[in-house]
A protein has these predicted regions:
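HIT superfamily nucleotide-processing domains
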Residues: 1-128
Length: 128
């Protein structure tokens, strides 16, 4: 069940500040507070969707189009073109990365890796 008090819902409602990049009627993007690279944004639909499948199954065509428009404009605003990563986590026990905020969002990541990114990569590869 969707929790309307999650941090992204509060950001969408303006209850918590964020470093906004792009917003439209259906979505908002802002910088990740724990970036893996120097260009790390979150693109979040305004509607109440727990994960990517929930969004794909229930969002209207207008919501989906607005979300992807926000995604493209975010990439353009960050100067992202040919080399980047996009991912979404789904579920507290997802195999690689656990979903920590249960409001669907995409991570758009580009640019130079941060120390936090290098630590995560080492953990994934079991390098000490």
């Amino acid at each position: 069940m969707y929790d309307s008090n999650n941090i992204f819902a509060k950001i969408i409602r303006g209850e918590i500040p964020s470093r906004k990049i792009v917003e439209n009627e259906y979505a908002i993007s802002f910088y990740d507070v724990n970036p893996m690279c120097d260009k790390h944004a979150l693109v979040v639909p305004r509607g109440e969707y727990e994960n990517i499948l929930d969004f794909a199954r229930r969002a209207s065509a207008a919501e989906q189009a607005g979300f992807w428009d926000c995604f493209v404009k975010t990439a353009d605003a960050l100067g992202v073109d040919g080399e980047f990563n996009v991912f979404a986590n789904a579920g507290a026990d997802a195999p690689l990365f656990n979903q920590s905020v249960f409001h669907f969002h995409l991570h758009l990541i580009a640019g130079h890796k941060t120390a936090a990114c290098m630590d995560i990569m080492k953990d994934m590869l079991c390098i000490k």
